[in-house]
Amino acid sequence: MSMSRLGLLLFVAILLVLLQSSTCLISSPSSIINPSKVKQVSSKPRAFVYEGFLTDLECDHLISLAKENLQRSAVADNDNGESQVSDVRTSSGTFISKGKDPIVSGIEDKLSTWTFLPKENGEDLQVLRYEHGQKYDAHFDYFHDKVNIARGGHRIATVLLYLSNVTKGGETVFPDAQEFSRRSLSENKDDLSDCAKKGIAVKPKKGNALLFFNLQQDAIPDPFSLHGGCPVIEGEKWSATKWIHVDSFDKILTHDGNCTDVNESCERWAVLGECGKNPEYMVGTPEIPGNCRRSCKAC
């Protein structure tokens, strides 16, 4: 083989290695998750802030995708689960599908890696804009109705991605939370709005992410997870919400009467007595079938 041909092959091999390395840096979640940037801010609920989770490019990209499709935000009715406009939530927003483009897919990968929760358990990202005076009153992210819980179960966790800085206001506040004992009290309370001083608060900072769990470790809804978005006093707030369920949210619901198990762990859970301990999830009702009807001998 001539030296020129050998040199060409070597050049191509090196180029492929460089391209593969670059791809890993962009798309491999494990290469960009840095645990040292995470700090716990609350023990009840379990809440954590990841500093610099998103790049400026990722933040700006999500905003640009959302700008043309913003609509008035809605809330879920506690009785029937239907979405409705309410003064409780005055922002505007839109959903962005998980596979919208490579940047969005990369963000989804990072979220799954950080939370240790499958991508299919998450809803699409909801990008929100809060203008002057707009807010989201204190609420829970787990469900009170049986309609929404039928698809993927409760929301086990929420991640709030802060896409912009806010001059004043716009904090996320947990009114009933218990502060983490080893938390660094570097946050200057004087910089917080009056709303944020009513509990443990996280200031919106571009690129940061807030993860908190809506369920306790025994899967019971956590009353300490009550949280709200304080009114924006100066500036404009952009954020993105990722709600993550205990089961697959992408799964298509069927009511064809087939006696099946949705989760591969159903048989083991049934042996452990979960059919009686957690009948809503395992067995369900005639209107909303559970996820482990076969193993629970409910059909």
UniProtKB/Swiss-Prot annotation:
One term under GO cellular component = Golgi apparatus
The residues forming the signal peptide are none
- Record localization: Endoplasmic reticulum membrane; Golgi apparatus membrane
Transmembrane stretches in the record are 6-26
Q: Which residues are glycosylated?
A: 165, 258, 263
Q: Which UniProt keywords apply?
A: Dioxygenase, Disulfide bond, Endoplasmic reticulum, Glycoprotein, Golgi apparatus, Iron, Membrane, Metal-binding, Oxidoreductase, Signal-anchor, Transmembrane, Transmembrane helix
Topology versus the membrane: Single-pass type II membrane protein
Q: What happens when the gene is disrupted?
A: Reduced root hair length and content of hydroxyproline in root cell walls.
Query: Which positions in this protein are listed as binding 2-oxoglutarate?
Result: 237
Q: Pinpoint the ShKT domain residues.
A: 259-299
Instruction: Kindly list the positions annotated as binding Fe cation.
Output: 139, 141, 227
All copies of domain Fe2OG dioxygenase, residue ranges: 121-246
The stretches that face the Lumenal side, renumbered to this chain, are: 27-299
Does Membrane appear among the keywords?
yes
Q: How is the cofactor bound?
A: Binds 1 Fe(2+) ion per subunit.
Q: Which GO terms describe its molecular function?
A: iron ion binding; L-ascorbic acid binding; procollagen-proline 4-dioxygenase activity
Q: Which reaction does it catalyse?
A: L-prolyl-[collagen] + 2-oxoglutarate + O2 = trans-4-hydroxy-L-prolyl-[collagen] + succinate + CO2
Which residue stretches are annotated as topological domain Cytoplasmic? 1-5
EC number(s) stated in the UniProt entry for this protein: 1.14.11.2
Per the UniProt entry, the disulfide pairs are 259-299, 266-292, 275-296
Q: What class of enzyme is it?
A: oxidoreductase
GO BP, one annotated term: root hair cell development
* PANTHER family (UniProt xref): PROLYL 4-HYDROXYLASE 2 (PTHR10869:SF165), PROLYL 4-HYDROXYLASE ALPHA SUBUNIT (PTHR10869)
Reported function: Catalyzes the post-translational formation of 4-hydroxyproline in -Xaa-Pro-Gly- sequences in proline-rich peptide sequences of plant glycoproteins and other proteins. Hydroxyprolines are important constituent of many plant cell wall glycoproteins such as extensins, hydroxyproline-rich glycoproteins, lectins and arabinogalactan proteins. Possesses high affinity for leucine-rich repeat and proline-rich extensins of root cell walls that are essential for root hair development.
Name assigned to this protein: Prolyl 4-hydroxylase 2
Q: What is the lineage of its organism?
A: Eukaryota, Viridiplantae, Streptophyta, Embryophyta, Tracheophyta
**Which gene underlies this protein?**
P4H2
